[in-house]
Every structure is written in structure tokens, then in C-alpha cells.
């Protein structure tokens, strides 16, 4: 199959999904462009900041478009390109975008509250606490997986088969650019806040010029640190991202990053159109696949939890309800921000599939390379067609894939901190009325340190060990969010039946996957090949996730059923 046909099919399906199904949802749910949003009603200059549609979209897209749409499809390609493409398109339009839009809508309609607090309002405090604990544990997995990926990418030193250590210019140069991004973003944030009336086109030009300048500096001044050192640097950055006002760091950084990511997408898209490489992957490799290391994987549920962010991701709901809902200036922007950002991410997932298909050998993805390396080298090959030197293209792509993970990391660090605070939040947010222990546990600095500490411990196991559990927990969170949004829609007399199919399917997929994960880790302990810091911690987290998932699912479904009975009784009366 020629990749040009695949990309055109994807664009048509995703475009039709946005214009057709997305607009239909907005109409059925009752998006009101005249309603006052939480960002306007509760503006505080910190979390609640009314922002333009493009600015909120930039934050949403750059936060959700993490490593998932690159990592997932490339790993899942072991089953063949057909099942991966089908799940990306079906999942993106009817599962992922619906969840992202729905959670953003529910949050905006409830004062910008997180999805956990929305659950408390319609289900009860116990449901909220269990959900918040689930979310917090999940954020630890995201921090662990993505920190490990970024530190591995930034690692300035590579050990060869003979033990000789050589410098990794691509990683070191990308690291310099990424660190410059943090400083420049803060300056840009101050400028945007000071010059509120700056035209959007002027802000865009300034952002693009700054990106080019930082890229040039990175090429000249690579920063060589090893992976462990980068772990510490990343944790320090995440601390700042968690506690600083949104307008000062996260919003301007996400805004600038989006131009870089869209540039990457456009370059890759045009590269596919010009080069239109053939898909060298097999179309379908069967329902059971055995890797070169002898590990057996089943199409169900492995495919669905591996692809993760490109099709549906619970993490997106935390971004939608945790940060984006507090910056939406007009309800009419929600379709573009919530549904639209997910559609664009799905397109990124399709491009990742095409990249691995183009570089595949003998019907399989190249062995010995990480998904990031496959993606970076594949896109760099596309960009070479435009005369861009391979070394420059490789650094640019390394920088882009690192930016994908970093923008998700800073959002999830903030969301993890907020989830931890919500766990111990009582009926009042007035600290003067709280006991000392509650003041400490709900303090944003303390909550951030605790969240990052446990995320760092899990990170030591490496992303390849954390990813399977992350994928399962991620999709389980999506299922729970869909149930929660359905409860909200039902309670407010809005159409909600469209959420039932994705909700039930994701519950079946994720509980199966996470049970498989527990069984696999137990077997490693029985074989004597497990360690506490890797399999042990994962096993503990997995068991907690299963228990919490069951409790939240039963609580929410019970509420849905009871509401139906209550409504029926009212109708009879």
C-alpha cells in the first residue's frame, strides 16, 4: 500500500469526524457562546486566565500530543499496519475526541472544576476521593515514563557494543534548545501579559523567530549531560512548572512549542505527499505476535492500550478539565480546543505509522532502535527531500519529539499536584480554617515534592518497563472519565447515550490489560527475575489501580442506573 493513499484517507475521515460528529455533539450538548466561562467569571491571573482560542488550543495540543502518538503506533505496528490504522481512525473520532471534548465541556459547565470535583458534585465525596487517588497514581506513571524518555533522548553520551563511550550530538543539541525554551518562554509570557492587545499574527511571528534563534544556539552549543543528571534537571523544571502561574511558563511555552510541532507535522505531511513511500510493514500479522525476545502479545487488549494517546487517552481529560477549562474565553472555542486537538493528534499517530512503515525491513519495524529514534530518523529522511542536511534534520526531530514529552510532563506535574491536594481537601479551601496536617498536605509545594518524588522512583525502572502499565491505566482512566461525563450529562438532562459504547469497550479492554500486567509481574517474581523498584512498585500500583477502578466504575454506573429509576418515578408521579 502506498502511504499517500493512507494519509489522504486519514485526512478525509478525521476532517469528516470534526465537521460532522464534533459539531453534532456540540449541538446536542448545548454549547452556549453567550454563557460566561469560568476563565472570565473567576479570573485570578494564576490558574483562571481568559485566553484566545489559538492560545488555549496550543496549550491543549502541545500538552496531549506527548510521546504517545509517536511511541504507541510504532510499537503496535508489530500487529500490522491495518489494525493500527483502523483503531487510530475509529478511536480518534468516536472515542478520544469525544472524551476530550466531553471532559472539557463538563468542567467548563461546572466552574472550571477538575473532573474529580465534577464527579463529587454528581456522585459524592467518596467517588471523588477514589477518583482523585486513581488520577494521582496515574500521573506518577506518566511522570515516570516520559521523564525516562526525555532523559534518554537528552543523554549526551552513547555506549557502544564494545563499551566505548561517544558523544551524542543530536541529544545534547536538542537538550540545549529545550532548556533555552524554558527561559525564553518565561520572558515571552511576561511580554504577552504586558502587551495583552498584541495581534495574534505578531505573537506568532515573534514565537517562530525565537524558535529559529534557539535552534541555532543549540546547534552551536550542545549541552552534554548523562541520563541520570538529566533526570534531576527535568525534576527541577517540573517543580517550577507545577507551582508557577500558568501565564508565566506553561502557556507561553506551549504556545511556542505548538508552532514547532505543527512545523514538524507539515514537514512530515508534505514529505509523505512528495516521497509517498510504500508501506513495507505487513498488513496484518495475526491475533497473536511473538517478539524477537520470545514475549507473546495478543491483539486484544495489547493493541488498544499500546496505541494510547493517538486514539483515546484518559490523560487528555486531566488536561481538558485541569488546565484548559480554566482558560477558555468562550464556550464556542471548546469544539476546536477539545475535539480539534485530539483529531490533530490522531493525524500525528497516522504519520508515525507511515514513518515506521517506510523504514520497515522484511515486513517488520527496525530492531535495536527506540520508537523515538525510528520516528526522528524517518522524518529526517522526509525532510532531506527539501534539501535540509541530515544532521540538522535529526537535531530538529530530536528536539520535536522531546518537546512532545516535555509539554505533557509539565502539564501532568501540575495536574498530579492538584490531584494530591484534592485528596485531602475538605469542605473549605480557606487554609485558616484547616488543621495543621491538612494545611501541609494541601500545600502546593509539598504536594509537588511528594508527586515528583514517587514519579522519580518509578522512573528508575525505565520507560520500556513502565509503558505497558501506563497504557493500561491511561485507558482505564478514559473509561472512568466517560462514565463520569455520562453521569453529568444525564443529571443535567443532556444527550449522553453516545458515551455508552466507548465507555463499555474501554472498561473491557483496560481491566483485561491491567490484569495481564499483574499476572506478568507475579510470574517474574516467581521466576526470581523481578526487582522491587521495577516490578515490585508496578505490581503495587497495578493492584491499587484495579481496586480503585472497580470502585469508581461501580459507583458511577450505580448512579447512572439510579438516576434512570428516579427520573422514571418522577415521570409516573
What kind of feature is each model-predicted range?
Residues 13-70, 258, 298, 302, ...:
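Membrane-interface "cap" regions at the ends of multi-pass membrane proteins
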Residues 51-68, 227-244, 256-258, 267-277, ...:
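Hydrophobic, membrane-embedded alpha-helices of multi-pass small-molecule transporters
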Residues 67-74, 91-99, 103, 107-111, ...:
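Membrane-helix boundary/coupling elements in multi-pass transport proteins
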Residues 125-140, 340-347, 393, 422-461:
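Loop-to-transmembrane helix boundary motifs in multi-pass membrane proteins
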Residues 272-289, 343-378, 411:
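Extracellular/periplasmic helix-exit of transmembrane alpha-helices
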Amino acid at each position: 500500500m502506498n502511504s499517500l493513499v493512507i494519509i489522504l484517507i486519514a485526512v478525509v475521515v478525521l476532517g469528516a469526524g470534526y465537521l460532522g460528529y464534533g459539531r453534532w455533539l456540540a449541538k446536542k450538548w448545548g454549547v452556549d457562546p453567550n454563557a460566561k466561562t469560568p476563565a472570565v467569571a473567576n479570573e485570578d491571573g494564576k490558574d483562571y486566565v481568559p485566553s484566545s482560542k489559538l492560545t488555549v488550543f496550543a496549550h491543549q495540543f502541545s500538552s496531549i500530543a506527548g510521546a504517545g502518538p509517536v511511541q504507541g503506533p510504532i510499537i503496535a505496528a508489530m500487529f500490522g499496519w491495518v489494525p493500527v490504522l483502523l483503531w487510530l481512525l475509529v478511536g480518534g473520532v468516536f472515542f478520544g475526541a469525544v472524551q476530550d471534548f466531553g471532559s472539557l465541556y463538563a468542567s467548563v459547565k461546572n466552574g472550571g472544576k477538575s473532573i474529580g470535583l465534577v464527579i463529587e458534585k454528581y456522585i459524592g465525596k467518596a467517588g471523588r476521593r477514589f477518583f482523585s487517588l486513581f488520577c494521582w497514581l496515574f500521573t506518577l506513571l506518566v511522570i515516570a515514563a516520559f521523564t525516562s524518555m526525555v532523559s534518554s533522548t537528552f543523554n549526551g553520551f552513547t555506549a557502544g557494543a564494545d563499551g566505548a563511550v561517544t558523544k551524542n550530538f543530536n541529544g545534547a543539541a536538542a537538550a540545549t534548545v529545550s532548556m533555552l525554551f524554558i527561559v525564553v518562554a518565561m520572558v515571552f509570557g511576561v511580554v504577552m501579559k504586558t502587551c495583552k492587545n498584541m495581534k495574534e499574527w505578531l505573537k506568532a511571528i515573534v514565537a517562530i523567530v525565537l524558535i529559529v534563534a534557539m535552534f541555532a544556539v543549540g546547534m552551536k552549543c550542545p549541552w552534554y549531560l548523562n541520563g541520570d543528571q538529566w533526570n534531576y534537571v527535568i525534576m527541577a523544571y517540573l517543580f517550577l512548572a507545577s507551582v508557577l502561574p500558568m501565564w508565566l511558563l506553561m502557556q507561553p511555552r506551549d504556545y511556542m512549542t505548538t508552532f514547532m510541532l505543527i512545523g514538524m507535522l507539515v514537514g512530515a505531511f508534505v514529505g509523505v505527499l512528495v516521497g509517498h513511500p510504500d508501506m513495507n510493514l505487513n498488513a496484518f500479522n495475526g491475533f497473536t505476535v511473538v517478539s524477537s525476545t520470545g514475549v507473546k502479545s495478543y491483539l486484544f487488549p495489547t493493541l488498544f492500550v499500546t496505541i494510547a494517546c493517538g486514539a483515546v487517552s484518559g490523560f487528555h481529560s486531566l488536561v481538558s478539565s485541569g488546565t484548559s477549562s480554566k482558560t477558555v474565553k468562550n464556550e464556542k472555542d471548546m469544539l476546536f480546543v477539545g475535539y480539534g486537538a485530539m483529531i490533530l493528534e490522531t493525524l500525528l499517530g497516522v504519520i508515525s505509522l507511515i514513518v515506521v512503515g517506510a523504514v520497515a525491513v522484511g515486513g517488520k519495524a527496525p530492531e535495536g532502535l527506540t520508537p523515538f529514534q525510528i520516528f526522528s530518523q524517518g522524518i529526517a529522511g522526509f525532510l532531506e527531500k527539501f534539501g535540509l542536511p541530515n544532521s540538522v534534520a535529526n537535531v530538529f526531530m530530536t528536539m520535536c519529539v522531546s518537546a512532545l514529552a516535555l509539554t505533557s510532563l509539565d502539564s501532568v506535574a501540575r495536574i498530579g499536584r492538584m490531584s494530591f491536594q484534592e485528596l485531602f481537601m475538605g469542605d473549605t479551601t480557606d487554609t485558616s480554617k484547616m488543621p495543621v496536617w491538612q494545611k501541609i498536605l494541601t500545600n502546593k509545594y509539598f504536594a509537588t515534592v511528594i508527586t515528583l518524588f514517587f514519579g522519580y522512583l518509578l522512573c528508575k525502572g525505565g520507560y520500556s518497563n513502565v509503558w505497558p502499565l501506563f497504557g493500561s491505566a491511561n485507558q482505564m482512566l478514559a473509561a472512568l472519565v466517560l462514565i463520569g461525563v455520562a453521569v453529568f450529562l444525564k443529571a443535567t438532562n443532556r444527550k449522553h447515550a453516545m458515551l455508552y459504547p466507548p465507555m463499555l469497550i474501554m472498561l473491557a479492554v483496560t481491566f483485561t490489560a491491567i490484569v495481564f500486567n499483574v499476572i506478568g509481574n507475579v510470574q517474574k517474581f516467581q521466576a526470581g527475575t523481578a526487582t522491587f523498584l521495577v516490578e515490585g512498585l508496578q505490581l503495587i500500583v497495578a493492584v491499587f489501580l484495579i481496586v480503585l477502578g472497580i470502585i469508581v466504575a461501580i459507583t458511577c454506573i450505580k448512579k447512572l442506573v439510579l438516576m434512570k429509576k428516579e427520573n422514571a418515578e418522577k415521570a409516573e408521579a
